């Protein structure tokens, strides 16, 4: 009996006590530094969740844009406004633009849709059904911005390369020459539509992808393995940059925003900035990371809303 108490009862009670204390104290958070705790918290911030209702999946395509999706400066005190649309890579930039908009005292409205380029009258998707749904969604966006008087319209996305097979006209386009011609023509037409509304277009180049690296890399490096390589290669955005470069004279007010000017040194892009992990998954920024990039973008380059109209 004595042996049973020593070998079983006492150890069991000890571990139950430790577990109970751990639960009560939320897992002994003080065992890590404040910096580590902050890194862990940043990794679990998701714009697609915080902007639920304003960012839609395919089955929510019919959701219409709405003033209910306003963010940043309160509408009543705002000195300007902007509309941001595109795919999930536009959604993950909402905290970035919210930070800049608060600084400029303007209001934003987001209307983003999974896997849909922000280009009007373009059938874009992995199949004809999805391409048609994307085109309809952008028609809804176009009607909304034409009914308003936005100062800026932000176009952001996971932009395609010349070898994309996601353009339909009406059949799937596979020729790189046709891809470039259709992409360029439809982008120009979209910018003309935006220009006619009186808004200044802002094109945002895409951010890097992790290519298999874990978004937790910088946290693992700090905790377990200082030798971990937590950097990735810059996204060249080759097709979009080539097209934009060829049409600048047509749109002298067009603003280009490239977060990689802050995130990267030449082609080398650390996965953290000022001690904050930037990503939440393979190719999306977390909310805290996006805000940190915005703060540095405003300081080192310029707030694109600096000339917001009163």
Predicted stretch roles:
Residues 1-310:
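Extracellular/periplasmic envelope-modification machinery, especially enzymes
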């Amino acid at each position: 009996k004595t042996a049973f108490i020593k070998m079983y009862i006492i150890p069991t009670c000890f571990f139950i006590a430790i577990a109970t204390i751990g639960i009560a104290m939320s897992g002994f958070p003080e065992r890590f530094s404040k910096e580590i705790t902050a890194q862990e918290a940043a990794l679990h911030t998701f714009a697609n969740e915080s902007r639920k209702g304003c960012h839609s999946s395919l089955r929510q395509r019919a959701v219409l844009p709405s003033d209910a999706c306003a963010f940043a400066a309160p509408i009543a005190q705002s000195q300007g406004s902007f509309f941001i649309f595109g795919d999930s890579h536009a959604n993950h930039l909402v905290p970035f633009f919210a930070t800049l908009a608060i600084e400029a005292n303007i209001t934003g409205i987001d209307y983003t849709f999974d896997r849909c380029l922000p280009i009007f009258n373009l059938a874009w998707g992995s199949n004809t059904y999805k391409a048609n749904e994307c085109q309809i969604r952008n028609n809804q966006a176009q009607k909304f911005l034409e009914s308003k008087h936005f100062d800026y319209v932000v176009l952001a996305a996971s932009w395609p390369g010349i070898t994309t097979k996601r353009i339909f006209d009406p059949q799937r386009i596979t020729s790189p020459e046709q891809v470039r011609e259709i992409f360029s023509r439809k982008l120009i037409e979209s910018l003309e539509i935006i220009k006619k509304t009186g808004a200044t277009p802002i094109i945002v180049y895409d951010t890097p992808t992790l290519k298999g690296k874990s978004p937790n890399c910088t946290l693992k490096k700090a905790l377990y393995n200082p030798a971990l390589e937590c950097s990735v290669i810059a996204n060249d955005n080759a097709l979009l940059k080539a097209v934009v470069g060829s049409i600048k004279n047509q749109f002298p007010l067009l603003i280009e925003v490239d977060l990689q000017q802050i995130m990267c040194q030449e082609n080398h892009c650390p996965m953290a900035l000022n001690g904050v992990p930037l990503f939440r998954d393979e190719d999306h920024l977390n909310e805290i990371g996006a805000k940190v990039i915005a703060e540095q973008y405003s300081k080192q380059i310029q707030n694109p809303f600096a000339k917001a109209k009163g």
